[in-house]
């Protein structure tokens, strides 16, 4: 199993000020991708969590630097982005109806994966929840 160092991250704090700190590490699962973060959007949702002990940011883009053995849709070097949801079960009624944000088993920003955010060096995200960015689009946009 491969362990991924998340590098430097920016977390919320009780005062609401961002805290720069060392992120933890993650074990790369079979369908995970490691993203070296290039840019992050700032969303109003980030303001809701600024006093939480969690890595902030859920509108990230970057370059894939590692992939798990089951990943087929993206490869190392691909430019990708991700958002609020990190995973869902895929078999409940909500998922089947296209509402994976309502999945009772979902992992998403602010609820789970509190060590993963786009305000940092690296993120580990399930490959099914990243989106390729065409080369013609600058990552800053």
Predicted features along the sequence, with ranges:
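Conserved Rossmann-like nucleotide-cofactor binding loop
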Residues: 43
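Conserved hydrophobic/aromatic positions in well-ordered beta-strands
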Residues: 8-10, 65, 123, 131
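Glycine-rich beta-strand-centered segment in the early N-terminal region that forms part
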Residues: 26-40, 48-93, 129-137
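NAD(P)H dinucleotide-binding glycine-rich loop of Rossmann-like/cofactor-binding domains
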Residues: 89-141
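Short solvent-exposed loop/turn micro-motifs enriched in small/polar/acidic residues
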Residues: 1-4, 18, 115-116
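Short structural boundary motif marking the start of a folded domain
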Residues: 2-10, 33
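Extracellular beta-rich ligand/substrate-recognition surface
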Residues: 9-18
């Amino acid at each position: 199993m491969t362990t991924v160092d998340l590098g430097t991250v920016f977390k919320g704090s009780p005062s609401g000020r961002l805290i720069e700190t060392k992120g933890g590490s993650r074990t790369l699962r079979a369908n995970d991708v490691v993203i070296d973060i290039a840019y992050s959007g700032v969303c109003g949702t980030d303001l809701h969590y600024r006093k939480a002990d969690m890595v902030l940011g859920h509108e990230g883009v970057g370059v894939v630097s590692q992939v798990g053995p089951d990943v087929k849709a993206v490869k190392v070097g691909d430019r990708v982005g991700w958002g609020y949801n990190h995973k869902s079960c895929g078999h409940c009624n909500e998922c089947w109806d296209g509402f994976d944000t309502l999945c009772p088993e979902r992992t998403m920003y602010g609820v789970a994966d509190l060590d993963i955010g786009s305000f940092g060096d690296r993120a580990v995200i399930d490959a099914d929840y990243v989106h390729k960015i065409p080369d013609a689009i600058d990552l800053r946009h």
